[in-house]
Amino acid sequence: MANLKEIRDRIVSVKNTRKITEAMRLVAAAKVRRAQDQVLKSRPFADKLARVLENIQSRVQFEAVDSPLLSKRDVKTISLVCITADRGLCGGYNTNIIKKVEIRYAELIKQGYEPNLILVGKKAIGYFQNRKDRYIIKTTFKELEQVPTAKDSEGITSEVLAEFLSENADRVEIIYTKFITLVSCAPVVQTLLPLDPQGIADENDEIFRLTTKDSKLLVEKSNIEKSDSEKLPSDIVFEQSPDQLLDSLLPLYLQNQVLRALQESAASELACRMTAMNNASDNAKELASTLNLTYNKARQAAITQEILEVVGGSAV
């Protein structure tokens, strides 16, 4: 059994570690709130844009419009946009998304396609750059804002558009972590290009708000309120041709899709970090309790031994 000083030092170390993990949990909880607020602030524009596209689609058949972002061609090369975090300490968040990318990459090769990667986040960059013999990396993005903004999505969108319009990629897919609840998230694959505008917000999307009660974090859940679709007047006349309208609106739509993926990934990362730090704090508390029990037993054994030595000495 370890001596009393070693056990006492371990108890102090575990308690200090618990203070750190508890602080990180609270910071992550605050940032989850910010990420949620950012999603709510960006949603009205995204929803309005979707409504406009739906109205234009009702007036103009997209199939008859000659837009490169809508055109489907024979697929040979596919670009995969992979979104991970720049940092760790967030449970299985990075591992799960990387595993999803590996599975999707292998599936595409098996189907006869030529996939390549557009990496977002230091964790994905570090992992796949160490495996360059197995994966083709086109571009990398790192050190984005912790709460993604339109500026962050602009660079990724420009790269995706350049790849698709230059026909270096016949299809572009994005792999990110969908925010489901504060304790649940899942990697998903979504096709970015060619576009198929059918609305931005999922009808099943829900908003999760963090609240506090008795010094504990609680979660409130509510469904997103869908705004009523505003129909364009039937006698409206477009000054621009449908091609010109869509050439202006579709890149905005694409950028919003990328921004939404970034925001959901950020919220998922923070939720995973909060959960991981909460588990670490609980484990540290349990370990400290076990060490205290061990310390008390060792101290009791030492005192008993001293008493026996005193009694034995006096008997002699």
Swiss-Prot record:
InterPro entries: ATP_synth_F1_ATPase_gsu (IPR035968), ATP_synth_F1_gsu (IPR000131)
Membrane topology: Peripheral membrane protein
Major site of localization recorded for this protein: membrane
Subcellular location: Cellular thylakoid membrane
Keyword annotations from UniProtKB, A to Z: ATP synthesis, CF(1), Hydrogen ion transport, Ion transport, Membrane, Thylakoid, Transport
Molecular function as annotated in GO: ATP binding; proton-transporting ATP synthase activity, rotational mechanism
Cellular component per GO, a single term: plasma membrane-derived thylakoid membrane
Gene3D superfamilies associated with the record: 3.40.1380.10, ATP synthase, gamma subunit, helix hairpin domain
Record note on quaternary structure: F-type ATPases have 2 components, CF(1) - the catalytic core - and CF(0) - the membrane proton channel. CF(1) has five subunits: alpha(3), beta(3), gamma(1), delta(1), epsilon(1). CF(0) has three main subunits: a, b and c.
Entry function: Produces ATP from ADP in the presence of a proton gradient across the membrane. The gamma chain is believed to be important in regulating ATPase activity and the flow of protons through the CF(0) complex.
Family: Belongs to the ATPase gamma chain family.
Protein name: ATP synthase gamma chain
Organism lineage string: Bacteria, Bacillati, Cyanobacteriota, Cyanophyceae, Synechococcales
